[in-house]
C-alpha cells in the first residue's frame, strides 16, 4: 500500500467519523424527537450510575466473603491469603466508592434536568398542538368599559382552546438515529434543542373587524361577536352594526437552536460558575458537560481478578508484603519484590485455575452449616457473608478458629452441594444414600469435618516442634 492509498483511507475514515458525530443531536427537529433525545441521554447517565453502583455492591460482597473465608481456610497461609484479598478489596472499594459518590451527583443532576426538560416539551406539545378554539360569549357593555375613550367594545372573557391527548412518537428514522450508543462523549459534543419560546409562549393569530358604527346597545352575541340594529344578525354580519374578533390559531411553532457541550481550553464548561439566569439549552449544556467532567469510573469487577494481576498490582503487593510474610517480617514492596512474588505464588498459585477455584469459586461451590443453640444456619460463603446472619457466621467461625490456634475448628462442617438432595428423604432412603446421613432427626448431607487437633501437634503452622497441652494452657493463664 503506497502513501497515496494510506492518505485516502485516513481521509475516508475521518469523513465517516465526522459524519456519525452528533447525528443524534442533529436528528432533533421537532418536539417528539427532542423528547426522545432527552430521555435517551437521561437514561445514559442513569445507567452509568447504576452500573457503577451495582459493580461496587458486588465488589463489597466479595470483600465480605473473603473476610469470612479467612476463618474457613484450614491452611494458615491460605487463610492469610483470603485476608489479604479482603484487605485489597477494601482498598479498591473505598477508593471507587469515593469516585462513585462524587461523580454520581453530577450525572444524576444532568439526568434530572433532562427528564424535566422532556416533561416540559411534552406538556408544550399538548398545548401547542392542533385543537378546537372557542371564543365564548362576548359582552359589549364590559367591552366599552374596559378600553378608555372607546365608543364601543366587544369583550371576550373566555377564549379557549381544547386539544385532545396526543401521543408523541418520533418517526422511526429519528428513533433509530437517536440511540443510547450515540450518547457517548466521543459521539456527542453539541446540543440541538427546541427553542425556549416553544415551552414558554403561546402565540395567538387573530383579526379584529367592525361594521357600521358599533355602540353599547348592539347586544346580539349569537355568532361570537356583537351585532344589532336593522337587518338580520348572521355569521356574515347581516346586521347593520357589528364588532368582533376572529382567532385563527393558538400555538407556537417549534424551531431548534444549537450550543456546544465541550469545555473551554481552561477545562471550564459552558457557563460554569455563572449565577445569571440561563436559557434551557444553556442550562442543560452546562449540566451535561459537568457530568462528563466528573469522570465516573465503573469499578473493576473483583470477580474477574486474575492470579497474574496479583503479581503486578501495586496496591495488592503492598498488602501482600505485610499479610503474607512469615514470622511477622515486613517486606519492602520494591526491594523484596521477588520474595513477595514467591509468597503470592505459594499462597495463590501455581496458576490461574487454582487461584480461581480456591478464592473465587470457593465462595459459592459449597454450603456450610452451623448451629447457634437450636437454630441451624447454612449457606455458601457468599450467602453467609452477605446475608442477615453475616455477623453470626463471622463470630462463630472466627471464635472456632481462635479456639484451635489458627486451625479450622474440628466441628466446623463443610457441606457440599448435596445438601438439597438429602432434604426431605425418609429415614430408610437417607440411610441407603451414599451422600446422606441422619442427623438431628433429619436427613442431611454427610459432613466433612476437619481433624481434631492433636494435643502434641503444632497448630501455628510456622514450626515443626510439638507443643504440650500443659505448656499451652500455662501460656493462656499467663496472658
Curated annotation (Swiss-Prot):
Keywords in alphabetical order: Cell membrane, Glycoprotein, GPI-anchor, Lipoprotein, Membrane, Signal, Trypanosomiasis
Compartments (UniProt record): Cell membrane
Membrane association type: Lipid-anchor; GPI-anchor
A cellular component annotation (GO) from this entry: plasma membrane
Disulphide linkage map: none
General function of this protein: VSG forms a coat on the surface of the parasite. The trypanosome evades the immune response of the host by expressing a series of antigenically distinct VSGs from an estimated 1000 VSG genes.
Entry keyword Glycoprotein: yes
Propeptide residue interval(s): 463-479
Glycosylation site positions: 120, 458
Identification of the protein by name: Variant surface glycoprotein ILTAT 1.22
Signal peptide location: 1-12
Lipid modification (GPI-anchor amidated asparagine), residues: 462
Amino acid at each position: 500500500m503506497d502513501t497515496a492509498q494510506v492518505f485516502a483511507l485516513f481521509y475516508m475514515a475521518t469523513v465517516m467519523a465526522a459524519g456519525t458525530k452528533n447525528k443524534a443531536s442533529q436528528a432533533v427537529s421537532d418536539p417528539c424527537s427532542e423528547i426522545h433525545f432527552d430521555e435517551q441521554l437521561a437514561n445514559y447517565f442513569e445507567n452509568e450510575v447504576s452500573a457503577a453502583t451495582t459493580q461496587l455492591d458486588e465488589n463489597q460482597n466479595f470483600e465480605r466473603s473473603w473476610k469470612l473465608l479467612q476463618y474457613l481456610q484450614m491452611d494458615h497461609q491460605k487463610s492469610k491469603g483470603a485476608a489479604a484479598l479482603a484487605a485489597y478489596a477494601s482498598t479498591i472499594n473505598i477508593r471507587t466508592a469515593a469516585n462513585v459518590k462524587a461523580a454520581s451527583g453530577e450525572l444524576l443532576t444532568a439526568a434530572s434536568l433532562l427528564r424535566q426538560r422532556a416533561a416540559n416539551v411534552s406538556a408544550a406539545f399538548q398545548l401547542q398542538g392542533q385543537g378546537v378554539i372557542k371564543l365564548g360569549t362576548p359582552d359589549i357593555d364590559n367591552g366599552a368599559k374596559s378600553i378608555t375613550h372607546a365608543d364601543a367594545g366587544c369583550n371576550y372573557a373566555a377564549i379557549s382552546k381544547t386539544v385532545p391527548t396526543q401521543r408523541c412518537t418520533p418517526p422511526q428514522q429519528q428513533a433509530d438515529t437517536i440511540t443510547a450508543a450515540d450518547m457517548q462523549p466521543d459521539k456527542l459534543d453539541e446540543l440541538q434543542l427546541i427553542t425556549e419560546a416553544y415551552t414558554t409562549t403561546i402565540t395567538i393569530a387573530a383579526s379584529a373587524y367592525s361594521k357600521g358604527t358599533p355602540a353599547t346597545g348592539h347586544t346580539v352575541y349569537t355568532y361570537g361577536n356583537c351585532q344589532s340594529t336593522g337587518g338580520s344578525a348572521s355569521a356574515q354580519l347581516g346586521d347593520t352594526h357589528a364588532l368582533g374578533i376572529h382567532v385563527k390559531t393558538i400555538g407556537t411553532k417549534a424551531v431548534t437552536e444549537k450550543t456546544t457541550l465541550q469545555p473551554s481550553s481552561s477545562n471550564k464548561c459552558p457557563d460554569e460558575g455563572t449565577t445569571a439566569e440561563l436559557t434551557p439549552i444553556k442550562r442543560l449544556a452546562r449540566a451535561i458537560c459537568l457530568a462528563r467532567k466528573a469522570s465516573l469510573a465503573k469499578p473493576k469487577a473483583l470477580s474477574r481478578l486474575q492470579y497474574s494481576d496479583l503479581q503486578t498490582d501495586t496496591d495488592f503487593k503492598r498488602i501482600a508484603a505485610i499479610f503474607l510474610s512469615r514470622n511477622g517480617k515486613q517486606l519492602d514492596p520494591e526491594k523484596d519484590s521477588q520474595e513477595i512474588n514467591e509468597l503470592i505464588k505459594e499462597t495463590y498459585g501455581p496458576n490461574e485455575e487454582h487461584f480461581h477455584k480456591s478464592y473465587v469459586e470457593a465462595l459459592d461451590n459449597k454450603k456450610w452449616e452451623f448451629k447457634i443453640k437450636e437454630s441451624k444456619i447454612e449457606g455458601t460463603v457468599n450467602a453467609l457473608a452477605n446475608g442477615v446472619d453475616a455477623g453470626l457466621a463471622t463470630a462463630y467461625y472466627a471464635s472456632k478458629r481462635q479456639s484451635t490456634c489458627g486451625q479450622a475448628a474440628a466441628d466446623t462442617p463443610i457441606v457440599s452441594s448435596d445438601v438439597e438432595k438429602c432434604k426431605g428423604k425418609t429415614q430408610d432412603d437417607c440411610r441407603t444414600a451414599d451422600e446422606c446421613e441422619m442427623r438431628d432427626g433429619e436427613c442431611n448431607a454427610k459432613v466433612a469435618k476437619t481433624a481434631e487437633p492433636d494435643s502434641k501437634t503444632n497448630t501455628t503452622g510456622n514450626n515443626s516442634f510439638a507443643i504440650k497441652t500443659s505448656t499451652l494452657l500455662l501460656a493462656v493463664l499467663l496472658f
